[in-house]
From Swiss-Prot:
Species per Swiss-Prot/TrEMBL record: Rhodopseudomonas palustris (strain BisA53)
Residue span(s) of domain KH: 554-613
Superkingdom of the source species: Bacteria
Any one cellular-component term (Gene Ontology): cytosol
GO biological process: mRNA catabolic process; RNA processing
Protein name: Polyribonucleotide nucleotidyltransferase
Originating gene: pnp
Length: 721
């Protein structure tokens, strides 16, 4: 019944198995990939006919994590998986990026990749396995895919690269880098690093490329057994049409792409396109060509003219040379009520970035396959349509916004202070108000400034820059701080973020083969120069974190109590802690290890809450003096509440100096008094005294008398001799 085929290799000290022919047999391509005990199913289905009216590759990728893979049941009322989590969205993009450029030009058939995590062993992250399984399924499917690709995760522990580090090793690694590509070329890099230098980062990329070669060979071996015949793609030779259109509008396009202002340039390009359309589609005549075809050739000519100009003249669309960064204006404190804010403008790209400080109550609970954890740093990126002068639908967060936000998050995460030193939940929001290239890197720069404006003690300011590449044969140009058009029409999108000490994040997407290690080295070196320049411009606004938090930010004090006292502080059903919060106005959060965080924008509220909690969680000191309140008057003395919920007895003989006939002659219920803790009787009852304490000043009269006696004795000693 089943026609199974499989291959198995040892990869990074663990078995990797790829199997097809048993599960999901009606899909065009289906592969079950197993690494350790992590298992994923990747399926590919491509429509039989091209989608009408599109000039792009209609590819969708969905990565899905099933909670049963980790032996868990989903939370919530419905107890089933809901909308995609942030990780599912990010991994879907991670898979999409290296496979998209490998489809044959002209493929317009709807193509869907679905990757399902079936088992997770809590050691091997499914994302790398998902990439490998997708590559294998595409290679088997018959879709015109110029693969296969391999992928690997690279760590850096104790100055050594580590292939596919397990989850426990990820805690100590200085690098989390994912690299994907073909046997000959790197296509995609995604990483977070702890301020590593360019040589280490490039070495990690090449290390990963070398070590996923066995995976590429394993997929080829599986394809030799089970691959379907590749589908034909009809490719039309447009050289004659290209030459014809070029003669019609070459000068118009060259002039348009010499206009530095984006909106004016787009208007000029639009006129050139209208000229072409009017030529090929005159009113009242039957057209010879499809409009989509003419538009596609026009778009191709746009790319060629921009690329020729850059390589021939060394000048870019806006007149810059290849290394110049656009003009930068950085401002901080631009919003009066925000805890921290910055406006970062670089050419026609602008980000308004706002930082908000929160407490433990604001932490985000993340429910992942490896367990539930709390995230204390959030970075959200918003890209409204007005930022590019367009109208558009407003609604849920798009995949691109999630991806760009995570890239900026990775850039800043390594420079944040440890949570135990700065116990705030941090939310950074980047509102892109203008965009013409590299808005994610503008978000990094603006976020760094906004965090410092809020008083967050970053290790060092962080900046980001987007690099591009034009490659034609032996000639190439690496471009610093690319425009949107240079991104779309170039061969590489290369984003680097970091401090003056090193790289914190690197993202690379390469659209063509043939980019060598040497070219990547040049790009990294040029990116470093640009990054240092941008940091210098940012320093004109702010060089370090502000010494004080913003006026409207909460203050948090942290201290510890014994774990066996947590129950007393919380009280039955939370009664005690609710009373503390209600009466002091402070927010209180208690961790399982006894760490207490007290937060309020009012310092007095914090002091009151801390005093209250400490009085419950600690024991009173012998011979210490406390403020107290008389809670009950008896014939033999008065009971005084003096230490949180603790009461003690002031015996009638300890009420005042001299003989006291009746307790009520000295105190009554509700009186505020000062008492000294004398000790505990045989039954553990607390003994207090009022007569040895000055009720006005709180001074210890016993200690005072003893000190005076010792002084008199010392002064009288010489006379006695």
């Amino acid at each position: 019944m089943f026609h199974k085929h499989s291959v198995e290799i040892d990869w990074g000290g663990r078995p990797l198995k790829l199997e097809t022919g048993k599960i999901a047999r009606q899909a065009d391509g289906a592969v079950v990939a197993t690494y350790g005990e992590t298992v994923v199913l990747a399926t590919v289905v491509a429509a039989k006919t091209p989608r009408e009216g599109v000039d792009f590759l209609p590819l969708t990728v969905d990565y899905i994590e099933k909670t049963y893979a980790a032996g868990r049941i989903p939370g919530g009322y419905f107890k089933r998986e809901g909308r995609p989590t942030e990780k599912e969205t990010l991994v879907s993009r991670l898979i999409d990026r290296p496979i998209r450029p490998l489809f044959v030009d002209g493929w317009r058939n709807e193509t869907q990749v679905i990757v399902t995590v079936l088992s997770h062993d809590m050691e091997n992250d499914p994302d790398i396995l998902a990439l490998v399984a997708t590559s294998a399924a595409l290679t088997l499917s018959g879709a015109p895919f110029k693969g296969p690709i391999g992928a690997a995760r690279v760590g850096f522990i104790n100055d050594e690269y580590v292939l596919n580090p397990v989850l426990d090793e990820m805690i100590e690694t200085q690098l989390d880098l994912v690299v994907a590509g073909t046997a000959d070329a790197v296509l995609m890099v995604e990483s977070e690093a702890k301020e590593l230098n360019e040589d280490i980062m490039l070495g990690a990329v090449m290390f990963g490329h070398r070590h996923f070669q066995p995976v590429v060979q394993a997929i080829i071996e599986l394809a030799e057994k089970a691959a379907k015949e590749p589908r034909d793609v009809k490719v039309i030779d447009e050289s004659v049409l290209e030459k014809e259109i070029l003669g019609l509008i070459e000068q118009d396009l060259r002039a348009a792409y010499a206009i530095p202002v984006k909106q004016d340039r787009y208007a000029a390009v639009g006129k050139a396109k209208d000229k072409v359309m009017a030529h090929y589609f005159p009113e009242g005549q039957e057209p010879q060509y499809d409009k989509l075809r003419i538009a596609g050739v026009f778009k191709e000519l746009e790319a060629k003219i921009v690329r020729w100009n850059i390589l021939d003249t060394g000048k870019r669309i806006d007149g810059r040379d290849s290394t110049t960064v656009r003009q930068i204006i950085a401002e901080v404190g631009v919003l009066p009520r925000a805890h921290g804010s910055a406006l970062f403008t670089r050419g026609e790209t602008q980000a308004l970035v706002v930082t908000t400080l929160g407490t433990g109550e604001d932490e985000q609970y993340i429910d992942s396959l490896s367990g539930t954890y709390k995230e204390q740093f959030l970075l959200h990126y918003n890209f409204p349509p007005f930022s590019v002068g367009e109208t558009g639908r407003m609604g849920g967060t798009k995949r691109r916004e999630i991806g760009h936000g995570k890239l900026a998050w990775r850039a800043l995460h390594p420079v944040l202070p440890p949570h135990h030193e700065f116990p705030y939940t941090l939310r950074v929001v980047s509102e892109i108000t203008e965009s013409n290239g590299s808005s994610s890197m503008a978000s990094v720069c603006g976020a760094s400034l906004a965090l410092m404006d809020a008083g967050v003690p970053l290790k060092r300011p962080t900046a980001g820059i987007a690099m591009g590449l034009i490659l034609e044969g032996e000639r190439f140009a690496v471009l610093s701080d690319i425009l949107g058009d240079e991104d779309h029409l170039g061969d590489m999108d290369f984003k680097v973020a970091g401090t003056d000490h090193g790289i914190t994040s690197l993202q690379m997407d390469i659209k063509i083969a043939g980019i060598t290690e040497e070219i990547m080295k040049v790009a990294l070196g040029q990116a470093k120069e640009g990054r240092i320049h941008i940091l210098g411009e940012m320093s004109k606004a702010l060089t370090n974190a502000r010494a004080e938090l913003g006026e409207y930010a909460p203050r948090i004090e942290t201290f510890k109590i014994p774990t066996d006292k947590i129950r007393e502080v919380i009280g039955t059903g939370g009664k005690v802690i609710r009373e503390i919060v209600e009466k002091t106005g402070a927010k209180v959060n208690i961790d399982d290890d006894g760490t207490v965080k007290v937060a309020s924008s009012d310092g007095e509220s914090i002091k009151a809450a801390i005093k209250w909690i400490k009085s419950i969680a600690s024991d009173p000191e012998l011979n210490a003096i406390y403020d107290g309140t008389v809670v009950k008057v008896m014939e033999f003395g008065a009971f005084v509440n003096f230490f949180g919920a603790k009461d003690g007895l002031v015996h009638i003989s300890q009420l005042a100096a001299g003989r006291v006939q009746k307790t009520s002659d000295v105190v009554k219920e509700g009186d505020k008094v000062k008492v000294k803790l004398l000790g505990f009787d045989d039954r553990g009852k607390t003994r207090l005294s009022m007569k040895v304490v000055d009720q006005e000043t709180g001074e210890d009269l016993e200690a005072k008398q003893k000190a005076e006696a010792e002084k008199a004795k010392a002064e009288g000693a010489p006379a006695a001799e």
